């Protein structure tokens, strides 16, 4: 399994005046990795420290590891008023069945959290006919999980006080996908 902690180094990602997306998502990625490894899944991370890794290298890491799937975590700051945005999943515009299954399994597990879910979407929030680089170039099932608005205290709980629960639910969704896809021996 390949887990992508986005941004890193001088690329901070979103910033709400207090928190950096790069830091929050590395922490979540580490927690998801630990959950998966506890279940016997081999995990490769695109970054494990606060370093910059370009998108080409991220894809190379996942593809070279022969990972069964790729999941990348992100945050948003679309609404500075703090209105909750909730969680969304993004897959390739062609809606490949394996990516749709992966994203759906994760979103189903996250259904129990106290934020809204906007389901599995294709493309990007700004352009439904354009793909995120990772979804466009991944050779395996892939999805981007957007974990809410950084200005929303409700959404922020997902990656602060509730991070362990969020990581467990995401890992459970990934495990469900891996089992359904035939990776029951805990590999990849």
Locate predicted features.
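Short, surface-exposed beta-strand segments enriched in small/polar/acidic residues
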Residues: 2-15
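Glycine- and acidic-residue-enriched helix-capping/strand-helix junction motifs
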Residues: 12-27
């Amino acid at each position: 399994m390949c887990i992508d902690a986005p941004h890193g180094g001088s690329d901070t990602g979103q910033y709400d005046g207090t928190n950096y997306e790069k830091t929050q998502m590395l922490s979540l990625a580490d927690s998801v990795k630990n959950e998966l490894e506890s279940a016997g899944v081999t995990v490769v991370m695109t970054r494990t420290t606060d370093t910059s890794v370009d998108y080409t290298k991220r894809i190379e890491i996942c593809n070279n590891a022969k990972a069964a799937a790729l999941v990348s975590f992100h945050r948003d700051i679309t609404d500075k008023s703090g209105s909750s945005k909730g969680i969304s999943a993004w897959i390739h515009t062609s809606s490949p069945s394996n990516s749709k299954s992966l994203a759906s399994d994760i979103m189903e597990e996250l259904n129990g959290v106290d934020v809204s879910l906007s389901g599995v979407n294709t493309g990007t929030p700004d352009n439904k006919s354009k793909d995120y680089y990772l979804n466009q170039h991944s050779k395996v099932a892939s999805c981007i999980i957007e974990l809410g608005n950084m200005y929303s205290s409700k959404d922020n709980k997902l990656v602060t006080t509730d991070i362990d629960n969020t990581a467990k639910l995401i890992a459970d969704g990934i495990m469900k996908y891996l089992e359904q896809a035939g990776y029951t021996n805990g590999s990849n």
